[in-house]
Amino acid sequence: MVILGSTGSIGTQAIDVVLRNPGRFKVVALSAAGGAVELLAEQAVALGVHTVAVADPAAEEAAARGPGGQGAGRPLPRVLAGPDAATELAAAECHSVLNGITGSIGLAPTLAALRAGRVLVLANKESLIVGGPLVKAVAQPGQIVPVDSEHAALFQALAGGARAEVRKLVVTASGGPFRNRTREQLAAVTPADALAHPTWAMGPVVTINSATLVNKGLEVIEAHLLYDVPFDRIEVVVHPQSVVHSMVEFVDGSTMAQASPPDMRMPIALGLGWPDRVPDAAPGCDWTKAATWEFFPLDNEAFPAVELAREVGTLGGTAPAVFNAANEECVDAFLKGALPFTGIVDTVAKVVAEHGTPQSGTSLTVEDVLHAESWARARARELAAG
């Protein structure tokens, strides 16, 4: 397999799964942005990979030197550098590609892996969301295995019946660290507050997206694209314990739920090993201890991101790309103190509204997506700057 984004949250946990299962998996290449070159080099030596890629050309020499500049006495891997390096790796000779890159820059590697016939273990939800029609046009049935805990849960629960028997998908959300706050209270949230997620350990962008529930909105769009279920049959409920990762309700009134303690190694291992399960991938539920699982309706007034995502997903075309790109810029502005917490989604909504009728249909191209993203980023920066 190839692991893209190996130094990030998903990538490091995937490597943990690989190292704890010697003989089961073989990693042949790694890629990273280039900000954690020492870690990338250490991973390369530990896994014995033959190729690494860094998006930042300035990191090429450091990556080639290996950990501590020495390479630990092993042959150093081949180093690819530049913005297209991960895309080149995605089409390399292998069985599967784990796309753990954060953001829409993961679109090109996603398309490259699918076109090359690789099994795509997808953690980079943004590539599916911004390039939905493009990705679906090249993906073969069963070629995409989702790694998001929610979509991995739906993936498993959907096996409980025929697709025609599905009444609705129920996507759970922890609610983030601010689930009981009003919109007025949310206006005072600081970056430090928002980066402290109560359940999951994630990178900064995903952590902020979880706090605003933009992440849940993206997951609703992703569920629609992965499973061809209409938006009006995809429900979001708040589940603070994050043990039930999602549910499928069938036409006879029965509901299939996937439950496990919050540990991303579980869905990662499922994706890496599919169609087989990896023994002891993560601890299971302790059924000998009393526990309470709570479910609450989502407060759409305080957290409008999910409803905005539904609107964007329904529009389709380039609208999801605009939504995602504007959000990435607004998160950056919030972290720099240029936008209040509530200003993130408010500004994204303004950019989406200004975008108007999106480019859509069978004529959608990668260039259309990139152009829409570029415009959305520039407009979001303008609005954030006041």
Curated annotation (Swiss-Prot):
Positions annotated to bind NADPH: T7, G8, S9, I10, A33, N124, E126, G203
InterPro entries named among the record's database cross-references: DXP_reductoisomerase, DXP_reductoisomerase_C, DXP_reductoisomerase_N, DXPR_C, DXPR_C_sf, NAD(P)-bd_dom_sf
Alphabetical UniProt keywords: Isoprene biosynthesis, Manganese, Metal-binding, NADP, Oxidoreductase
Binding site for 1-deoxy-D-xylulose 5-phosphate: K125, S149, E150, S174, H197, S210, N215, K216, E219
Documented EC number(s): 1.1.1.267
Annotated GO biological process: isopentenyl diphosphate biosynthetic process, methylerythritol 4-phosphate pathway involved in terpenoid biosynthetic process
Matches recorded under PANTHER family: 1-DEOXY-D-XYLULOSE 5-PHOSPHATE REDUCTOISOMERASE, 1-DEOXY-D-XYLULOSE 5-PHOSPHATE REDUCTOISOMERASE, CHLOROPLASTIC
The protein's name: 1-deoxy-D-xylulose 5-phosphate reductoisomerase
Organism the protein comes from: Kitasatospora griseola
Gene field: dxr
